[in-house]
Amino acid sequence: YDREVFTSFADDLGVIHLTADTDKALNFSFGMNRPEHYKVTADGNDLLMQGQLPDGVDTLEMKGLRYASRVRVILPKGGTVTPGDSTVSVQNASEAILLVSMATDYFDKDLDGKITSLLANAGKKDYASLKKAHVAAYRSLFDRVELDLGHSSREDLPMDERLAAFNEDQDDPSLGALYFQFGRYLLISSTRVGLLPPNLQGLWCNTVNTPWNGDYHLNINLQMNHWPAEVANLSELHLPLVEWTKQQVASGERTAKAYYNARGWVTHILGNVWEFTAPGEHPSWGATNT
């Protein structure tokens, strides 16, 4: 059995590819879940998750973002798809492609229309085409820069062993180059023009209630996320931050007037995607002007 998984900016969805070296050897069921605030149903042969989050003020009032996700299975070499109440089963398949689309109503009010359209467009392509488009979209950014600091004999070591060896002997220059490219990978994977800039916890946060609400800390963290943008030839990935900053102006003007009776605009140490510009959290540091 082989499994490949990637998320694609080219098609704006996740792709799971399952194969077996024996005909009709794939037999499985799949579902979706999260820790809270969700409902999963089978909708035809799709699996549909829907929910609405708390508003962040009153956890009993479910008036926050709405979200939805669909999973559609495609069997290029045949097999059977059987929907259940909250799972979908596949029998006697040799290859399966699971397409996972998702959206919130932050950008798209027609959630189901959005995620259904993504699946319809991606479903017209075979797996090779989906993967090719994904790799091309990534490499169009990643391949712009190479960094050669020299080589060492440790380059073939597993990363945990390589890091342990580095603690004992720092003569591993290509590890620094790899770490440089890792930073570029994180920014490339986090945003595109027209989307939001990467936040404090990033896309890979593993908790529902993220530390510091996954906000934008303006003292240094937001800047650190964008350090690779200009110097590492990823300038367009700086644009989401520029647009986000523009969105703070109207709110920041009200904050400047209310708190300081000042002209212009101001924000403080905490920001978010809803134009929060007032002092926040603790008075010892929450009033830091930015």
Predicted segment positions?
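Aromatic-residue-lined binding/catalytic grooves and analogous aromatic/hydrophobic interfacial grooves
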Residues: 1-281
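Active-site neighborhood of glycoside hydrolase catalytic domains
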Residues: 288-290
